[in-house]
Amino acid sequence: MNIYLIGILCIVGLIISQGSTANGSPLDDRFNDVNTINKKQFTEEEFSRLINSMLKKYIEDKNVDIRIIGNKKDKQPTQKTTPKPTTPKQINDGTSDKTSDTHTIKRTTPKPTTPKQINDGTSDKTSDTHTIKRTTPKPTTPKQINDGTSDKTSDTHTIKRTTPKPTTPKQINDGTSDKTSDTHTIKRTTPKPTTPKQINDGTSDKPKSIADIFLINKPKVPLWIVNPLYYMVEKFVQIMGYLLEDDDTLELNLPKYYYDKSI
């Protein structure tokens, strides 16, 4: 857009705004209300009433928030996980009907050994049918452990001593070893140092925001250099305010930091 068109639009806008508020009654009423509020002297009771009402409203809002959170928790019940009871191993002593393939222990009772009858000629019974053979239990020989020193080999009772293989620790390739391992190589990852965030406490030269550039407290950066268009519009508004000054209108008092003290 052309700069002249922008200037014309600004002039028209100012004339319309000044014409609509020429009577000044709405502005006067508003300023009067503000002045009466500022001049009013509040008593201690009014202050206490105001503080109590604010605290009451704060507590009510807080209770509402707590109720909302409680309702959300009630709608989503937590599922309780109960641990399964551990059943003891069943011993099959002959009275139970249930059979367990893995945990059943059979109780074997030894048969009573009856003494062998000796036929001394006085008995009528023949020894062919009623002779009881004395069965002597075989001595239980310990199982032979084939440790390499014995020459005898046992097919059934030989227990092979299996020594566990020593677990070799995984090699960490730190650059000093020549051997490379495809599967057991562990890469040593060093965490990156965390740099603390810089806090702008006012001593730094970097501006905190764009508003710092436009503040007039810094005489090194004049406003008309930073933004010439803004400077021209500001001066134009001041001139139009003085030209249109009447008894019904108020002088345009801009904030202090809008004025350029360096000029």
Curated annotation (Swiss-Prot):
Compositionally biased spans, kind Basic and acidic residues: 95-104, 122-131, 149-158, 176-185
Sequence repeats: 81-107, 108-134, 135-161, 162-188, 189-206
Low complexity biased stretches: 78-90
Cleaved signal peptide residues: 1-21
Region annotation (Disordered) ranges: 70-207
Record region (5 X 27 AA tandem repeats): 81-189
Alphabetized UniProt keyword annotations: Repeat, Signal
Miscellaneous comment as given in the Swiss-Prot or TrEMBL entry: This antigen is recognized by sera from infected human. Isoforms are highly similar and contain variable numbers of identical direct tandem repeats of 81 bases.
Name of protein: Antigen 10-3
Organismal lineage: Eukaryota, Metazoa, Spiralia, Lophotrochozoa, Platyhelminthes
